[in-house]
Amino acid sequence: MLEYHQGPVIGLHPMFGPKVESFSEQKFVVCPGRNDETFEWLLNWIRILGGNIIVCTPEEHDRLMVFVQATQHFSRFSLGAFVAEEEVDLNRSLLLSTPNYQQEIDIVKRLFAQNPQLCVEIMLATEERCQAIARLASTYNRLAQLVAQKDRFGLIQEFEKAQEFISNFRF
């Protein structure tokens, strides 16, 4: 945008879908561009309506959206496609399910309530997203190979490695 428009520029990415009816507690990622003070009225308005402003560079935004959006969409898209291929009776499975399964199916259901063009665009928007999805698929394949080999030790090692990484974060 900066090279195509000489005036004020700001990157604004609402982190919610079109069905949200209120800005309250919703996140807006803001990437400063040029003459940022020009947009202070807009950011203040979002804050007044209860929105949360998170500032980052465009580079950080793009790098993290690979994981926040693209790989998550692919993972849930894959699970939805698998459930459809397997013709799982979702109503019956939900009767027999854990709370975690219910939450996951709810998330998958929300994904498939969206516009398919938007979902696909989110996954294919950049080469970095496509490459990350390929790496995720490679991880799935590597772990599936351990399952196929009934390699308990290998699976536990993979679990503990991920567990150690994730446990270092305080949410």
Where are these regions (language model features)?
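An accessory alpha-helical subdomain
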Residues: 55-171
